Amino acid sequence: MLYKGDTLYLDWLEDGIAELVFDAPGSVNKLDTATVASLGEAIGVLEQQSDLKGLLLRSNKAAFIVGADITEFLSLFLVPEEQLSQWLHFANSVFNRLEDLPVPTIAAVNGYALGGGCECVLATDYRLATPDLRIGLPETKLGIMPGFGGSVRMPRMLGADSALEIIAAGKDVGADQALKIGLVDGVVKAEKLVEGAMAILRQAINGDLDWKAKRQPKLEPLKLSKIEAAMSFTIAKGMVAQTAGKHYPAPITAVKTIEAAARFGREEALNLENKSFVPLAHTNEARALVGIFLNDQYVKGKAKKLTKDVETPKQAAVLGAGIMGGGIAYQSAWKGVPVVMKDINDKSLTLGMTEAAKLLNKQLERGKIDGLKLAGVISTIHPTLDYAGFDRVDVVVEAVVENPKVKKAVLAETEQKVRPDTVLASNTSTIPISELANALERPENFCGMHFFNPVHRMPLVEIIRGEKSSDETIAKVVAWASKMGKTPIVVNDCPGFFVNRVLFPYFAGFSQLLRDGADFRKIDKVMEKQFGWPMGPAYLLDVVGIDTAHHAQAVMAAGFPQRMQKDYRDAIDALFNANRFGQKNGLGFWRYKEDSKGKPKKEEDVVVDDLLAKVSQPKRDFSEEEIIARMMIPMVNEVVRCLEEGIIATPAEADMALVYGLGFPPFHGGAFRWLDTLGSAKYLDMAQQYQHLGPLYEVPEGLRNKARHNEPYYPPVEPARPVGDLKTA
């Protein structure tokens, strides 16, 4: 043994060839600060070996290196800029020394090589991969950019276009694509990986492969003519501006850095990468996006822990076909859980099957599946007008009309047709689960399972625990949701549960702004362009359906009369009474016509201004700041109340539900992350300016207490140790 660290070791293989093996104590390898330091020590040992002829890098895990240790990021991002810059210089000196070894090097890459893992193998001369490879640089999705030389080496290896596509989008590629663009030099079966890598290494040692020529381009300026450079970087900047926008500075910073570094060799190019990385790491956007990643891991870990002792449902059923039922059936079948889809109407069954077939055909068109796979999936969806096969299902989700009487009748009837241990769930969006449970003989086997539309795209499923829902019931539906590829978040029961309960105060803020003379077009523009929502409130209401919102608004008002009962006719009432239901009938805040792709395209409709004039004061202008405050305060206050009342368990789960269920702008990180960034004291000062608008603007007492001491909702993070300590961590 030449060297043994906590996460890697170095040993001789044969005849002057050494192997450096990443083998962390846990289930995966991460390129954390300790591993970077250990890698530097191992390379120091190699540099002393006069008889060294070649080096093989490999992993003892199912994945090579999954990336940097993101749990360290928030503390690293608090380190002063100068210290963070020094540590990056140290880390890059390690990879430079690996790249500068006087012998050929190869990485045998299996599974994931992401972020720092990818940057590590870019420093070797050759890369051989297994078919399950996923390799790439996802850093821009975390609000930063590659910091271990990825933005320097990848463009010089692949050319600017391929590298920009990966780096700016934060994407990863599979083995075939990696081979095609030159990111790896070959792909072999897993059992042949080390053998194949050794064969390449021997060829390089013997002079059959010119490893020095392979290495040289990574040390030099990027080989691009002025015209090629202008085309590549202009196109890349245009694409980034279109897709990322101003709220996500990392992608455009990465592109500009690669452009600026193109005319320099490795050392100066790395300095430019360092100078760009450090300011990004100190942005609110980076902290928010890293926070989302960590919250996502927390939520998924919680679901995994919850389901460790239950069997995932093997057969499911959906009550009520149509678009929603068809979407749920498709998602279940697509992920391998056969499903019975029941409706009392043959026309609805046809609609549900058509929806599933449409989604599968899209996968076929994109080349994700072949005809055989399509036929196989669709054959596991069984449409029926009766209860045939219900005696074999493990879980049933009801997705009929949003009417408590109808839902109770359907659930009670279904309970008599299934096994005593079958779990029933309702896809209701607002009706309390404990109320629906009153119709059942086995309420302990019942809970809520709130999917979001469109089901195949929206990652969140709210799992609602009723007063009598058993732990096993909750665990079974969480297991099914996870199997479907969704992110399940368990909430406690109340009208609207969590997501809709906090959404309708937001809509109330919108209605009050309109009542006071604001223009809905400006509100939408501000909330989309300035705050960052994917849709403004008017457009969102048109997509949700004005009739749906009108009904849900009444349910929420009955559930929370002190805050959500209004004493005036609002814009939703006005449009509903005019039979303007949004996209579903082509008339809402806008008029809708199908474009060439069959998608609804919004157009101005002057009739709307006349309708709204009847329920609002004369038009007046509001500042962007006032619009944002009046829209967000009711939502944030209600989010805080949900935490204080135990409807949602943690700030992390609340923020993920908002991001995954409502499209809360990820660069804000969710309501609690936004609150922490703003500061609870500053938020209280802002909210107090609008308390005259009513109970929705009154700040909850718990938040007032935090504001007195300016306390955050997320646990404070301590800065990482000084750079000198980090080097030897």
UniProtKB/Swiss-Prot annotation:
GO MF, any single term: long-chain-3-hydroxyacyl-CoA dehydrogenase activity
Region (3-hydroxyacyl-CoA dehydrogenase): 311-729
InterPro entries linked to this entry: 3-OHacyl-CoA_DH_CS (IPR006180), 3-OHacyl-CoA_DH_NAD-bd (IPR006176), 3HC_DH_C (IPR006108), 6-PGluconate_DH-like_C_sf (IPR008927), ClpP/crotonase-like_dom_sf (IPR029045), Enoyl-CoA_hyd/isom_CS (IPR018376), Enoyl-CoA_hydra/iso (IPR001753), FA_oxidation_alpha_subunit (IPR050136)
Complexes and interactors: Heterotetramer of two alpha chains (FadB) and two beta chains (FadA).
Function: Involved in the aerobic and anaerobic degradation of long-chain fatty acids via beta-oxidation cycle. Catalyzes the formation of 3-oxoacyl-CoA from enoyl-CoA via L-3-hydroxyacyl-CoA. It can also use D-3-hydroxyacyl-CoA and cis-3-enoyl-CoA as substrate.
HAMAP family from the UniProt entry: FadB (MF_01621)
Name the UniProt record assigns to this protein: Fatty acid oxidation complex subunit alpha
Organism the protein comes from: Escherichia coli O6:H1 (strain CFT073 / ATCC 700928 / UPEC)
Gene: fadB
